[in-house]
Amino acid sequence: STSSLSSAQWKKVEDALANMNNDCMGGKMIGALKDKNITIVHDPNIKANGLYNPKTNQMTIKDFKESEVTNKDLERTLFHELLHSLQTHNEDAKLNLEIEAHLAVYRYAVRKGISLADSKYSNILLLSKSLDEKYNVIDADLYNDFYQKVINDFKKIDFYKDFKESPSARNMNTNKNLAKDCE
C-alpha cells in the first residue's frame, strides 16, 4: 500500500529535482509542472520503478534507496514520471508515450553521466541518433527502423506487452516542446 514520504525520502526527491533543474530540459519540465500539484507517494510493491496516474495526478515511487548518499536511479525515475505528467495521456498510444519518455531519460542520463544498465536502452541509443538535439527526425528510414526495433524490445517486457502503439503518435511532441529552447 502507498504511504507518505519520510523526511529522508523528501530530501532525496529535493536533491534529484535540484539536479534536474540544472539541466535545460529538466528545468523546463519542472517549470511546466509548478501549477500541477503532483502528489508523490511510496509503494515498495509496484512492478515498475515509478508510476504516474494522470487521473489522480499522483506519482508512485518504488524505492528511495535511503542507504545511498546519492540516488541517480531516483533522479532517472523522477525525470521519467515527470515527463509522463506533461504528455497528453492516450490509452491508444501508451507505448509511444513510454518510448518518448525512455528516449528523454536516455539523453538526460547521457548528459548527466547516469548509468543505464538496461537492455531497453540499446536500440533507444540508435533511435536517438536518428534525431537532432531538438528531437526532429534527421534520418526517416533510420528513425522508422529503430522505432520499430524499440517497439519490439518493449513488447518482450511483461509490463509493456499490452500497451497499445499508434504509428500516428510517433512524434516526440512533448520532448520537442521541452527541448526547443535548449542548447
Give the role of each language-model region:
Residues 1-21, 95-183:
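Active-site or metal-binding loop neighborhoods of secreted/extracellular toxin and effector enzymes
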Residues 76-89:
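Active-site recognition of the HExxH zinc-binding catalytic motif
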Residues 44-51, 88-98, 113:
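Generic structural signal for short, solvent-exposed loop/turn connectors between secondary structure elements
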Residues 13, 17-20, 38-40, 59-61, ...:
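Hydrophobic beta-strand residues in large extracellular and virion-surface proteins
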Residues 71-76, 94-100:
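Alpha-helical scaffolds flanking conserved acidic
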Residues 30-72:
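Catalytic zinc-binding patch centered on the HExxH motif and its immediate surroundings
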Residues 2-3, 63-68, 89-92:
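Second-shell loop/turn segments in exported
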